[in-house]
Amino acid sequence: MRIWRKSIQLQLITSMGAALLASILVVVIIFTVALNRLTDRYLVDTALPASIEAIRNDIERMLGQPLVAAADIAGNTLLRDWLAAGEDPAQAPQFIEYLTAAKQRNHAFTTLFASTETGHYYNENGLDRTLSRSNPKDKWFYGYIDSGAERFINIDIDGATGELALFIDYRVEKEGKLVGVAGMGLRMTELSKLIHDFSFGEHGKVFLVRNDGLIQVHPDAAFSGKRQLAEQLGADAAKGVMTGGESLRSSRFSRDGERYLALGLPLRDLNWTLVAEVPESEIYAQMHQAVWLTSLIGGAVALVSLLLVVLLARGLVRPIRRVTAALVQIGSGAGDLSHRLDDSRQDELGDLARGFNRFLDSQRSLIGEVLSTSERLRRAVEQVTQVVDNTAERSGRQQEMTEMVATAVHEMGLTVQDIARNAGDAAQASQSARDEALQAREVVQRSIRGIEGMSGDIGKAADAVSQLADEVASVDEVLAVIRSISEQTNLLALNAAIEAARAGEMGRGFAVVADEVRTLARRTQLSTDEVQQMIQRLKLGAGSAVSSMQAGQQATGSGVESSQRTGASLSAITDQVEHISDMNHQVATATEEQSAVTEEINRTVQGISDLARETAAEVQGCREECQALRGLADDLARQMGGFRL
């Protein structure tokens, strides 16, 4: 705390540096928050959902033709009648040929149909096997016919080839009675490639999940058909991405100490959900890099700015230190009044230097006058001393001749000396009073000039504040235009929202944009009202400032008048002091005349020895006083000589 109070430079550097660092820190924090929101809006709400929706569209487009083809097989009336009639072996080859043609036409892995009555399972190669409820491999068939579902899509291992395939099965009914199941199997190559090729960041994944939570297709083959979604994401996150209608669903979860974002998008009419998981560290990686880069740049800017602050503080403090050094040098005894500060600056430091130089000039002039006066005093004392010495010699010779009238001459001599001494003291006092009055008048004149300059500055400041009030008034017109624009924008956004509502599903996106525009317009209007209120307060403050400055200007005018009256009074006092000084000189002249008369009397009463002895004693005392006075004059000259002019 003591160091803080002793150094203005440290105060400037610390305060300005703290303000600079705080400003940069606020900017970095605002940038980080804004970038985080922008990342969420673009990547989480736009880019990633768009990628998932594109994959869903590709999957639905990939399965569209096979679904139609499988439905055609199940809807074949000849096949339906043949299964209902008991599967005549003579007609079996033509249906096998039909399955072969359907397989080739749709590039299927296999085509099939099975009878619910006999359990016979046919593919393009003929009768493959007989299904049984007791066989675990046939559980899919009986589970499907027992479910009553119109269509069954499943990923399973083909019994004939042992390869993983996507099976699409439809019910074959005749007159409302289930007679069989027909469909086809597709190779998983293209679908698996589509799932594996998904890339969002370095570790982003996408996989297909059945509505019961079983993962059907996963980039890691060990998860496909063997792992529940709840095991992969956690129960809460799995529930979040699997429920919620036909729109995109999102949830966040942690795994192995890392945060993930999970998104789920249902596949229309397929009872599957496309699920994607992406580490949050990869979503926000570029944002974190941008924040670090911004922080580094902000730190570099802060260091450079702090260096500039240090240089600026040193430049501001250097002239003050020069003034301090000069004052310390004068006060320590060096007395160098010839030193001057650089007053070329036009700012407050230049004013300080000019004022200090004027102070030194006035002190130099005053001390010069004192030196001149002390020299004259020393010469006068020497002359008086010489006169006293001569008088002592004459008084010795006159001692025997002045004995007869010693008493009378002694009384007269004392009286004359008292009058002379008093007259000299009065003359010296009046001269000192005159000098002090002249100095006081000069000080008052400088005060008048300073007050007049301050009055002019206050007038200029009042004009500047008035101009500021006029400029603030012009801002009201701009705010009125902004408010009008925001109201028109709000009206246009409302019309756009109405038109978008009329457009139905096609205008839903445009309605969202229109609603955002209306929200922005309302915020603009509220901000405009707040700015207008602030401007009104600013106008009131400017008016108060103008009134205060005008009152201050009037007060300084009164001060100028009072100072002028004081100067006039001091001038009158100076005149009176000069008159008193003239009267003292007349008294001194009269005293000198009386002293001459006394000398004549002394010459007349040379025989009176007592008066001569008294006169000799007084002359000796006067000699001693003159010696002491000469010593004081020498001391004064020596002390004043310590100043360098």
From Swiss-Prot:
Domain Cache: 51-276
InterPro entries: dCache_1, HAMP_dom, MCPsignal_dom
Function statement: Chemotactic-signal transducers respond to changes in the concentration of attractants and repellents in the environment, transduce a signal from the outside to the inside of the cell, and facilitate sensory adaptation through the variation of the level of methylation. McpH is a chemoreceptor that binds and responds exclusively to intermediates of the purine degradation pathway.
Protein name, per record: Methyl-accepting chemotaxis protein McpH
PANTHER family xrefs: LYSOZYME-LIKE PROTEIN-RELATED, METHYL-ACCEPTING CHEMOTAXIS PROTEIN MCPB
Membrane topology field: Multi-pass membrane protein
Localization annotation: Cell membrane
KO phenotype (gene knockout): Mutation abolishes chemotaxis toward xanthine, guanine and adenine.
Main localization of the protein described in the UniProt heading: membrane
Gene Ontology cellular component list: plasma membrane
HAMP domain sequence ranges: 314-368
Species the sequence originates in: Pseudomonas putida (strain ATCC 47054 / DSM 6125 / CFBP 8728 / NCIMB 11950 / KT2440)
Gene name linked to the record: mcpH
Sorted UniProt keywords: Cell membrane, Chemotaxis, Membrane, Methylation, Transducer, Transmembrane, Transmembrane helix
Alphabetical GO biological process terms: chemotaxis; signal transduction
Top-level lineage group: Bacteria
Segments forming domain Methyl-accepting transducer: 373-609
Bilayer-crossing regions: 15-35, 291-311
UniProt similarity note: Belongs to the methyl-accepting chemotaxis (MCP) protein family.
